[in-house]
Regions:
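P-loop NTP-binding/switch modules centered on Walker-like glycine-rich loops
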Residues: 1, 5-83
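Charged, flexible cofactor/metal-binding loops and thiol motifs
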Residues: 55-138
Length: 138
């Protein structure tokens, strides 16, 4: 879809949301659209929510390694403004019959034995920010 048409449609959706009190559920990989239209974001990986937060908080302070990698992959106009680049390596888990533990573990640079052995649950990190990652276990 042409970018200008896409912007017009998104603006129309936002106007309708404000006028009629609508709620939308967007499923997309286009993080620019997500940031523009969302007040709250849930990041999913192989069917599991790995992070959930208000939009500004998620973009300013991503906690889960997958969320960080997604945000690092957003193109920036000038390379000198890019702080870091995360590359997701490793093999995808089987989405039909996933191994125990975090589904992102086979591709995570921070993976520990705990990640491989138990499913992480969303933890409240404050300010409406939740993350499912052993890096944030107490």
């Amino acid at each position: 879809m042409d970018v200008s048409i896409q912007a017009q449609i998104l603006n129309l959706l936002m106007d309708l949301q404000e006028e009629r009190g609508l709620t939308y559920l967007f499923i997309t990989h286009n993080l620019s659209v997500v940031k523009h239209i969302s007040s709250e974001i849930a990041v999913m990986y192989l069917g599991q929510c790995v992070e959930k937060a208000p939009a500004d908080e998620l973009f300013d302070n991503p906690l889960h390694p997958y969320t960080r990698a997604l945000l690092d992959a957003i193109p920036v106009p000038r390379l000198e403004y890019r702080d870091k680049t995360s590359v997701i390596r490793g093999e995808l888990s089987n989405p039909i019959d996933p191994a125990p533990g975090c589904r992102f573990a086979p591709r995570c640079d921070h993976c520990t034995e705990a990640c491989r052995n138990h499913d992480c649950q969303l933890r409240d990190m404050g300010e409406g920010h939740y993350v499912a990652c052993t890096l944030y276990e107490k």
